[in-house]
Amino acid sequence: MERYDKAALNAADVPPPSFSQNGGSLVSTLKTLLFFTILMIMLPIGLYFSSKVYVFEGTYGMSNRDSYFYAAIVAVVAVHVVLAMFVYVAWNEGSPQWREGKQD
């Protein structure tokens, strides 16, 4: 039977490191993700219907068929704008040390 060193057994009793430093960063990241998720859903749908009714049919007097087509283009452009904004915010949200490389 092996005898275990008491110091080695006490080393296992050390609590795991606290991740509270990253907790705020995680909450901030989730808030950003939730914001852009809602924006990704609401903005294109809202722009589709509002541009169809008020801009293309109301202002320009287009037919129902043509207004569907152009409103869809507006919605697709809105999706791409939201995606570009998300990538920009996500890129700049990281710590400057991570982007520049670790400097000791």
Curated annotation (Swiss-Prot):
It comes from the Eukaryota. The chain crosses the membrane at residues 29-49, 69-89. It is found in: Endoplasmic reticulum membrane; Endoplasmic reticulum-Golgi intermediate compartment membrane; Cytoplasmic vesicle, COPII-coated vesicle membrane. Keywords: Cytoplasmic vesicle, Endoplasmic reticulum, Membrane, Transmembrane, Transmembrane helix. One of its GO terms (biological process) is vacuolar proton-transporting V-type ATPase complex assembly. The keyword Transmembrane applies. It is a multi-pass membrane protein. Coiled coil: none annotated. Residues 1-28, 90-104 are cytoplasmic. One of its GO terms (cellular component) is endoplasmic reticulum membrane. Residues 50-68 are lumenal. Required for the assembly of the V0 complex of the vacuolar ATPase (V-ATPase) in the endoplasmic reticulum. HAMAP family: VMA21. Belongs to the VMA21 family. This is Vacuolar ATPase assembly integral membrane protein vma21.
